[in-house]
């Protein structure tokens, strides 16, 4: 039984095993657990290694990127540093080049100074040699007597004890005596320096110049005149440290201000303070309706003396403020320059014939314009880099109003003021021309600003100048003349005969303080009216007016160089007015002035040549800006004027010296006498006139005589005229035009 039961259990187990084996998959598809574990472990390890590799690679990439960025930053820094070093090197090169140029200029200046000193020493040596030769001829050489025989016999018989004394008392030679005598004479002729001498400083010299300033024609100095003036309606004037008490003399207060400033201020601060204080005082007097204006012209004269004393000590800002103030002052007294040309029929002349108030107004206006000119002259002496600190729109607007008053067309002109206004314009053009970089100033002073100014200069150029009518007030407005009521010297120029200069002192009482001027009658001026008709006075005034026109031509020439491309300035109008002026002056020389014994004929010839130079530059460099109708307008006059330069017999004009001497005696005798005086100076210096100097003087005389006679001009001007005539713009090909031209010229 037990075996049966065991057999049954064994058969059941086998069945179970078989069933289990039947349900299992094939053997080759089964993976042992170890391999399965390996398969599960391999991807995980691969993932770990790949992530670690990726992390390492990303770290390496980040490091490389950081290194690249760092290298790029360092490269850019090095590049910037190289650029900076290159810029510094260029700056150093430029600085070194400037220094080299400055050293070269300085070296050349030193060489020039040494050459001058050497030449001076050589001249002194020659003069000393000549003086020594002259003395040697006059002096007689004195022979020294030989020692006497008695002395020689005594010296032979002297005792040994006295021999030493005899040896010490040797006779001296004549040369040593002569040398000692000359040394003594030199010592006696030497002037010893005073060790206690005190050299005045700049402020002391400045104070002295103000205290000694005197207007030409006045009997008293300016400070002495102000010492006799007081403020009547202004109770007390006070500005900072400048105080004028009621009834106190103006000059005394100014002197006390000068003494206080001298102790504490340097020269530049001294000048700034004085200009400001005096300007405020002038303003208070001018704007007060009841206060007398008697002190104003003398205060303006003091301001001019302050400005021009030391140009380097007057700052640009002080000059600018002073310029604006004077323009405002002229605006206050503008009624002086707005006198109608023709008197009204309603004027019955019943007012009192007094002149003192008119004289004060004329002095204020004239001195103010002189101060404007003086300010710009001081500015011109300053460094070129500082010019732009002065000019701005306010300066230009103020001066535009001022020059329109001076260069008037609708009112009676005042010649003293015209000179200053024209010179201010000339200085402005010279400043622009001489600047290293003038583009900023050219853009500030544009062509539109110049348009009206040039028109007024054209009108001034058209006015005629006659020596007999320079003081004639009955002539028309086409002739330049000076009124006898304006005949006083200015602060810069001595124009006229200063007939009214003596009346300045008559305004002032010498024995009391005053605020109102003394009475001056117009009849006092008419007493010496015959003096104005003297020829020499007329010639002097004519010379001044001719120089005025030369200044106008200088302005045109400067504008050609500055605004050559600006058609609003350089255009056919300039050609028209220049051609008319050239033709008119040549006709006057031929018809009226040849044969007159006038010292101004050569100056008129210079104006003709100067005008031709302007026309030549217009024609040569700016022809595109000239319109054809403008050229046709003056074509006949211009052709005639140019032919007058060419039609002369060059070979025979100066051939006969005797004939030229006769011509000089007829047309230029005064200048001939002047040259003879110069020749006498040479004869006094050299004991005889050197041949080369004589030839040079003769050549100058002959050229001058030929120009005055209008028969010979210099070759360069003839070449200018020939160049214009031979240009394609003139068509002189027809026989009728050529015949009419030659007939009109008398050929």
From Swiss-Prot:
Which modifications occur after translation, per UniProt? Phosphorylated by MEC1 in a cell cycle dependent manner and in response to DNA damage.
Q: Which InterPro entries does this UniProt record tie to the protein? A: DNA_damage_chkpnt_Lcd1 (IPR018622)
Q: Which GO terms describe its cellular component?
A: ATR-ATRIP complex; cytoplasm; nuclear chromosome; nucleus
Respond yes or no to whether keyword Coiled coil is given for this record: yes
Where is this protein found? Cytoplasm; Nucleus
Which proteins does it associate with, and in what oligomeric form?
A: Forms a complex with MEC1.
Protein name (Swiss-Prot/TrEMBL): DNA damage checkpoint protein LCD1
Q: Which organism is it from?
A: Saccharomyces cerevisiae (strain ATCC 204508 / S288c) (Baker's yeast)
